[in-house]
Design a protein with these regions (language model features):
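Bacterial Sec-dependent N-terminal signal peptides
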Residues: 1-21
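Short S/T/G/P-rich N-terminal loop/turn motif that feeds into the first structured element of a domain
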Residues: 18-236
Length: 236
């Protein structure tokens, strides 16, 4: 993804100054997809760009899920911020003052059947620009150890050998912390969806990491792994 968080969401390289990001997951029925994308890329991306130019956020992105069923999310928004104050300030989403358009005229709320929002803190990242990403969600038995090992072992290993990736990062979830939900995510970004699929199939050699305790830290592995592809970023 082009700038996941330099994102995202949660592919790309926007995390240089980012500390926080939110992901909004939505389920858009197929018959609404074209209108949903039109409104988001034509209007809401401009509002986000205005916010970015005025120092209120770092980036905004829209990605679509590759595959999946009709009963789950198929699009996600990624908003990237420097501070928690920025991330929780909903007043910045004001099309009337920014574009001179009434919010109801460009609302997409009626175009999706379900929505969920999560907030995250960036714990580690390596910059790069791609067009697709694998989002890996998990619930480690030891959250602090998971973050520490990614920062001290996996991050340095990927800096030497990205194993086909163009971007990588780790995020810790800050809300909706319940037993059935993930508490961390990592992202592996690639130049194309095809490369993301090859990665999932084990077709890229990966760096070797000594002294990893990840099988103890997260014995059940990732709880979900999803490929997403960029629709648009406010800042490429």
């Amino acid at each position: 993804m082009k700038n996941f968080i330099t994102i995202l969401f949660l592919t790309a390289g926007l995390f240089l100054n980012a500390q926080y990001y939110s992901i909004t997951f939505v389920n858009v029925p197929q018959e609404n997809v074209a209108e949903f994308e039109r409104l988001e890329t034509t209007y809401w991306s401009k509002i986000a760009k205005h916010n970015i130019e005025n120092g209120k956020q770092l980036n905004w992105g829209l990605v679509s899920r590759v595959g999946g069923g009709t009963d789950t999310w198929n699009y996600a928004f990624i908003n990237v911020y420097e501070t928690a104050e920025q991330m929780t300030d909903n007043s910045i989403w004001d099309p009337k003052s920014i574009l001179g358009i009434d919010p109801q005229d460009i609302s997409t709320n009626h175009l999706y059947s379900g929505m969920g929002i999560t907030h995250w803190n960036v714990k580690a990242s390596i910059q790069g620009t791609g067009n697709a990403a694998v989002w890996n969600f998990g619930r480690p038995a030891n959250l602090a150890a998971f973050i520490d090992e990614n920062q001290k072992l996996w991050g340095p290993a990927f800096e030497k050998d990205m194993g086909g990736r163009v971007n990588w990062g780790v995020g810790q979830k800050l809300n909706n912390i319940e037993q059935e939900y993930s508490t961390v995510m990592t992202w592996d970004s690639f130049e194309s969806v095809a490369d993301a699929i090859k990665f999932m199939n084990g077709e890229f050699s990966q760096p070797q990491v000594r002294n990893s305790k990840m099988t103890e830290i997260m014995p059940d592995g990732f709880t979900a792994r999803v490929i997403v592809t960029d629709v648009m970023w406010a800042v490429d």
